[in-house]
Amino acid sequence: EFARRVTKLPGIGNLAVRRKIFRKIIDGLGGHLRLIICGAAPLLPETAAGLNDFGIVTIQGYGLTETSPVVAAERPEDLAAGSVGKPMPSVEVTIENKDENGIGEIVVKGPNVMMGYLDQPEETANVIKDGRFYTGDLGKFDDEGHLWITGRKKNVIVMKNGKNVFPEEIESIIDKLPYTSESMLFTREKHNELVLWVKIVYKPEYLEDTGVTFAEFVQTVRGVLAAINEKLPKYKHLHRFLLTDEPMIKTTTQKVKRNLEIEKINQQWQEELCYNNSI
């Protein structure tokens, strides 16, 4: 909070002053750290904002191998913590098939876009149309032109009322909890409607460090998820949660293999190997 106030004071909201005021923090990070560039995975907005407030310029960017690779990036003079900044020069970024919140698929056009996948014409045709590359990522632009990534198109959950749920939106909230290692949303059918469940991989050391029993821990999680529900529209409400300390199945790039996880959940559910709790 003090950092926020310092950066807003007239005449001293500059890097040199911030680095001097927060010298102890910077020294704790080695003393010479001036710039952080983050890509591949999102950085929590509060983390980026905090580092910038301390005088360590923290920039997020976005790109893919198919786009050589940078599509957009923050600039030191134009930071928007949580976004991936604005498109690079000569790169055109549009949002296709927007929903009511302005979220749609990110499409890229420019000299940085690949010619195609080697010897894979069908795969190339699926992602490149009229020279425009369909990334499969979902995002939106804010009023200042900053690009925000909201998830992957293939991960979108379409409810029976036609509403879209972007699992990463809710998972990112749950993943911030001190006892959460990772989480994943999925659906179950109830009274001919789809409802949301969440699998939470918890940190066993949290129970050891706090001294709470597992039963007490379950009640804590239930209460926190109920509080999260209060801030979400009804169709995004979580109905049940599964607790486990077993890591999820991931790709080599540490992305959760959702389909395999759902198969695993179905098996555990039948064999009663997971803790199933209502909210």
What are these regions (language model features)?
Residues P42-L43, E189-K190, K203-P204, T244-K250:
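Short, internal active-site loops enriched in acidic
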Residues M184-T187, A226-I279:
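Conserved C-terminal "lid"/linker of ANL adenylate-forming enzymes
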Residues G13, V17-L147, K153-V156, K176:
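Conserved AMP-binding/adenylate-forming
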